């Protein structure tokens, strides 16, 4: 299938992945997990929501936990260059027959919300309330010391169409998994805006669903430390996969599940992709190193389970990729 070309002059300027809004069924339990075990910092909270961020982040929040009756991913947030980009985004959406709304969101500037053609619920904002970063507040460090939100990974029922849509928005392909043969289909794609391996990864599967969101950590030892913390604080069963190293992205990783089953990746050691002539790296779906350069094979849950988007029907994928699943 066609590999999208880099678009260097997109209709509006998305800078990076910014924040995720999660619907959770037990706000206290979710807060305790993300604050005390993982180590994110609570910036604000009330009876209906908790706002957290990593120690490197100047923005008010990078994850919002919202009290709800059903667990789901409510929104994926991206930061744009300035308020003018929001108006350009609105014009682009209108020209392409997509509805949008400007919504008031706590601690954020103007926020544009829309649902893309594939059911992913997105919001764009240029500004948030500012907070001092906490990098040098070692007395506040807990868990694995998360630094910053790095990326989102989603299950998409129509991978090629989703990849093509986000390529039009300036997301540049860094790596991809493809079937062998002259008519091989793309089954997964890693796309970036900020100059590392990805801000947004698109994976073949029942969708739209969130596979995971990820925080960047300073070292692999922080990931190993989190394993110790989770094992000694009642969360051993929440460690789903890893630690290990991906072939795709070269990242050292750990996947854990929160009390509602939302999947969080702790992530470090990928690489720079910001050069304009950076060539995407192709992986054959028959090459097991793409998922696991070393470490235990991924369990079935990692391939099959994800968080639905609030109010969106989940559809079967257009094709079923041949992947290796651990027994």
Residues covered by each model-derived region:
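Conserved short beta-strand elements that form part of the metal-binding/catalytic scaffold
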Residues: 40-74, 120-128, 176-211, 217-220, ...
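Residue-level detector of secondary-structure transition/capping positions
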Residues: 38, 94-97, 170, 231
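Conserved active-site tyrosine of GNAT-family acetyltransferases
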Residues: 30-35, 93, 119, 162-166, ...
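Core segments of cupin and vicinal oxygen chelate
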Residues: 12-15, 21-59, 103, 113, ...
């Amino acid at each position: 299938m066609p590999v999208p070309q880099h678009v260097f002059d997109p209709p509006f300027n998305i800078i990076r992945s910014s924040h995720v809004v999660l619907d959770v069924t037990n706000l206290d339990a979710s807060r305790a997990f993300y604050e005390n075990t993982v180590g994110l910092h609570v910036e604000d909270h009330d009876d209906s929501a908790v706002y957290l961020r990593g120690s490197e982040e100047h923005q008010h929040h990078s994850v919002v936990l919202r009290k709800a009756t059903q667990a789901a991913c409510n929104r994926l947030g991206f930061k744009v260059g300035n308020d003018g980009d929001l108006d350009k985004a609105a014009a682009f959406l209108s020209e392409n027959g997509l509805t949008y709304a400007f919504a008031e969101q706590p601690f954020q500037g103007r926020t544009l919300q829309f649902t893309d053609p594939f059911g992913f619920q997105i919001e764009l904002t240029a500004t948030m309330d500012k907070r001092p970063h906490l990098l040098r507040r070692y007395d506040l460090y807990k868990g694995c010391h998360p630094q910053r939100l790095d990326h989102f990974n989603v299950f998409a029922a129509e991978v090629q169409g989703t990849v093509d849509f986000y390529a039009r928005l300036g997301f540049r392909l860094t790596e991809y998994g493809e079937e062998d043969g002259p008519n091989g289909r793309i089954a997964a794609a890693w796309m970036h805006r900020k100059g590392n391996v990805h801000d947004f990864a698109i994976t073949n599967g029942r969708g739209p669903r969130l596979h995971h969101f990820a925080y960047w950590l300073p070292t692999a030892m922080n990931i190993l430390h989190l394993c110790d913390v989770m094992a000694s604080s009642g969360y051993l069963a929440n460690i789903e996969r890893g630690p290990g190293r991906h072939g795709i992205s070269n990242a050292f990783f750990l996947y854990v599940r929160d009390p509602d089953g939302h999947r969080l990746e702790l992530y470090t050691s990928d690489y720079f992709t910001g050069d304009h002539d950076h060539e995407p790296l192709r992986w054959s779906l028959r090459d097991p190193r793409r998922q696991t350069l070393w470490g235990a094979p991924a369990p079935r849950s990692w391939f099959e389970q994800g968080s639905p988007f609030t109010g969106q029907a989940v559809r079967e994928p257009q094709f079923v990729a041949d992947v290796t699943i651990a027994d």
